[in-house]
Amino acid sequence: IAEQLRRRHRMRRVMHLSAEQFTNDFISSVGNSGITAFRRRYREVDALLIDDVQFLGAKKATLREMLYTVETLASAGRPLLFSGLQAPSEIAGLSQELAGRMASGLVCPIQPLDIDIRRQILERWIADRCPLEVPASLLDQINPMLAGDGRVVSGVANMINTLQRMFGR
Protein backbone atom coordinates (compact mmCIF):
# COMPACT_ATOMS: atom_id res chain seq x y z
CA ILE A 1 0.00 0.00 0.00
CA ALA A 2 2.80 2.40 0.89
CA GLU A 3 4.46 1.78 -2.45
CA GLN A 4 1.18 2.32 -4.31
CA LEU A 5 0.69 5.64 -2.54
CA ARG A 6 4.16 6.68 -3.63
CA ARG A 7 3.75 5.55 -7.24
CA ARG A 8 0.12 6.13 -8.13
CA HIS A 9 -0.59 9.14 -5.98
CA ARG A 10 2.88 10.64 -6.11
CA MET A 11 3.11 10.88 -2.35
CA ARG A 12 6.76 11.29 -1.44
CA ARG A 13 6.49 11.25 2.33
CA VAL A 14 4.72 8.00 3.17
CA MET A 15 5.52 6.76 6.67
CA HIS A 16 4.99 3.00 7.16
CA LEU A 17 5.96 1.47 10.49
CA SER A 18 4.76 -0.68 13.35
CA ALA A 19 3.07 0.69 16.46
CA GLU A 20 6.07 -0.58 18.40
CA GLN A 21 8.42 1.51 16.23
CA PHE A 22 6.20 4.55 16.77
CA THR A 23 6.26 3.93 20.53
CA ASN A 24 10.02 3.43 20.66
CA ASP A 25 10.61 6.54 18.57
CA PHE A 26 8.30 8.54 20.82
CA ILE A 27 9.99 7.32 24.02
CA SER A 28 13.42 8.04 22.56
CA SER A 29 12.41 11.55 21.51
CA VAL A 30 11.01 12.33 24.97
CA GLY A 31 14.21 11.12 26.61
CA ASN A 32 16.36 13.17 24.27
CA SER A 33 14.21 16.32 24.35
CA GLY A 34 13.45 15.82 20.66
CA ILE A 35 9.66 15.86 20.83
CA THR A 36 9.40 18.74 18.36
CA ALA A 37 11.40 16.82 15.75
CA PHE A 38 9.31 13.70 16.46
CA ARG A 39 6.07 15.60 15.88
CA ARG A 40 7.38 17.17 12.70
CA ARG A 41 8.54 13.77 11.40
CA TYR A 42 5.13 12.16 11.92
CA ARG A 43 2.73 15.05 11.39
CA GLU A 44 4.19 16.40 8.16
CA VAL A 45 3.82 13.19 6.16
CA ASP A 46 1.63 12.68 3.11
CA ALA A 47 0.29 9.38 4.51
CA LEU A 48 0.74 7.40 7.72
CA LEU A 49 0.46 3.61 7.84
CA ILE A 50 0.82 1.85 11.19
CA ASP A 51 0.81 -1.93 11.69
CA ASP A 52 0.03 -3.90 14.84
CA VAL A 53 -1.95 -1.16 16.59
CA GLN A 54 -2.88 -3.61 19.34
CA PHE A 55 0.63 -2.90 20.67
CA LEU A 56 -0.53 0.60 21.65
CA GLY A 57 -3.03 -0.55 24.27
CA ALA A 58 -2.48 0.94 27.76
CA LYS A 59 0.53 3.09 26.76
CA LYS A 60 -1.06 6.35 27.86
CA ALA A 61 1.54 8.88 26.73
CA THR A 62 2.00 7.12 23.38
CA LEU A 63 -1.77 6.88 22.91
CA ARG A 64 -2.14 10.60 23.54
CA GLU A 65 0.64 11.42 21.06
CA MET A 66 -0.85 9.02 18.50
CA LEU A 67 -4.27 10.66 18.92
CA TYR A 68 -2.87 14.15 18.34
CA THR A 69 -0.91 12.91 15.33
CA VAL A 70 -3.99 11.21 13.86
CA GLU A 71 -6.12 14.32 14.45
CA THR A 72 -3.51 16.57 12.82
CA LEU A 73 -3.22 14.35 9.74
CA ALA A 74 -6.96 13.68 9.46
CA SER A 75 -7.79 17.38 9.62
CA ALA A 76 -5.28 17.94 6.80
CA GLY A 77 -7.00 15.24 4.72
CA ARG A 78 -4.02 12.90 4.82
CA PRO A 79 -4.59 9.16 4.34
CA LEU A 80 -4.28 7.06 7.49
CA LEU A 81 -4.16 3.27 7.57
CA PHE A 82 -4.04 1.12 10.67
CA SER A 83 -3.76 -2.64 10.85
CA GLY A 84 -4.11 -4.87 13.85
CA LEU A 85 -5.25 -8.22 15.09
CA GLN A 86 -8.51 -6.76 16.40
CA ALA A 87 -10.97 -4.03 15.54
CA PRO A 88 -10.10 -0.71 17.22
CA SER A 89 -13.04 -1.02 19.63
CA GLU A 90 -11.73 -4.41 20.83
CA ILE A 91 -8.16 -3.35 21.66
CA ALA A 92 -7.73 -3.33 25.43
CA GLY A 93 -6.42 -0.03 26.72
CA LEU A 94 -6.96 1.90 23.50
CA SER A 95 -8.63 5.22 24.31
CA GLN A 96 -12.18 5.68 23.07
CA GLU A 97 -11.12 8.80 21.19
CA LEU A 98 -8.38 7.03 19.25
CA ALA A 99 -10.50 3.92 18.68
CA GLY A 100 -13.25 6.19 17.38
CA ARG A 101 -10.86 7.98 15.03
CA MET A 102 -9.58 4.65 13.71
CA ALA A 103 -13.10 3.26 13.35
CA SER A 104 -14.35 6.39 11.55
CA GLY A 105 -12.78 5.03 8.40
CA LEU A 106 -13.31 1.65 6.86
CA VAL A 107 -12.78 -1.24 9.29
CA CYS A 108 -12.25 -4.48 7.39
CA PRO A 109 -11.65 -7.86 8.95
CA ILE A 110 -9.02 -9.74 6.97
CA GLN A 111 -9.78 -13.40 6.51
CA PRO A 112 -7.16 -16.08 5.86
CA LEU A 113 -6.39 -16.53 2.18
CA ASP A 114 -8.34 -19.28 0.48
CA ILE A 115 -6.40 -21.84 -1.55
CA ASP A 116 -7.16 -20.26 -4.95
CA ILE A 117 -6.18 -16.72 -3.93
CA ARG A 118 -3.09 -18.07 -2.17
CA ARG A 119 -2.07 -19.86 -5.37
CA GLN A 120 -2.50 -16.70 -7.47
CA ILE A 121 -0.45 -14.64 -5.04
CA LEU A 122 2.24 -17.31 -4.86
CA GLU A 123 2.48 -17.47 -8.67
CA ARG A 124 2.71 -13.70 -8.98
CA TRP A 125 5.33 -13.27 -6.25
CA ILE A 126 7.45 -16.10 -7.60
CA ALA A 127 7.23 -14.63 -11.11
CA ASP A 128 8.29 -11.22 -9.74
CA ARG A 129 11.07 -12.46 -7.47
CA CYS A 130 12.52 -15.65 -8.88
CA PRO A 131 15.03 -15.69 -11.73
CA LEU A 132 13.93 -19.13 -12.95
CA GLU A 133 10.52 -20.52 -13.76
CA VAL A 134 8.93 -22.69 -11.08
CA PRO A 135 6.99 -25.71 -12.38
CA ALA A 136 3.23 -25.64 -11.79
CA SER A 137 3.46 -29.14 -10.30
CA LEU A 138 5.71 -27.80 -7.52
CA LEU A 139 3.26 -24.99 -6.78
CA ASP A 140 0.46 -27.58 -6.69
CA GLN A 141 2.37 -29.44 -3.97
CA ILE A 142 3.34 -26.36 -1.94
CA ASN A 143 0.07 -24.43 -1.99
CA PRO A 144 -2.10 -26.80 0.14
CA MET A 145 0.60 -26.85 2.83
CA LEU A 146 0.48 -23.09 3.34
CA ALA A 147 -1.73 -21.60 6.01
CA GLY A 148 -2.17 -18.10 7.30
CA ASP A 149 -1.78 -14.75 5.67
CA GLY A 150 0.23 -13.27 2.84
CA ARG A 151 3.38 -13.17 4.95
CA VAL A 152 3.59 -16.95 4.81
CA VAL A 153 3.21 -16.89 1.02
CA SER A 154 5.83 -14.14 0.78
CA GLY A 155 8.20 -16.22 2.90
CA VAL A 156 7.82 -19.22 0.61
CA ALA A 157 8.44 -17.06 -2.48
CA ASN A 158 11.56 -15.64 -0.80
CA MET A 159 12.75 -19.14 0.10
CA ILE A 160 12.32 -20.37 -3.48
CA ASN A 161 14.13 -17.27 -4.76
CA THR A 162 17.03 -17.87 -2.36
CA LEU A 163 17.31 -21.56 -3.23
CA GLN A 164 17.27 -20.78 -6.95
CA ARG A 165 20.03 -18.22 -6.55
CA MET A 166 22.11 -20.54 -4.37
CA PHE A 167 21.81 -23.61 -6.57
CA GLY A 168 21.11 -22.04 -9.95
CA ARG A 169 18.10 -24.22 -10.64
Where are these regions (language model features)?
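Conserved AAA+ ATPase "SRH/arginine-finger" region at the nucleotide-binding site
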Residues: 90-92, 105-117
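Walker A/P-loop
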Residues: 1-15
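Sensor-1/coupling segment of RecA-like P-loop NTPase cores
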Residues: 68-69, 73-96
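Conserved AAA+ ATPase "sensor/coupling" helix adjacent to the nucleotide-binding pocket
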Residues: 86, 105, 117-132, 159-163
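Conserved alpha-helical scaffold flanking the Walker A/P-loop in AAA+ ATPase domains
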Residues: 7-8, 25-50, 56-72, 125-128
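Structural recognition of the conserved hydrophobic beta-strand(s) that form the central parallel beta-sheet
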Residues: 16-17, 49-51, 79-86, 109
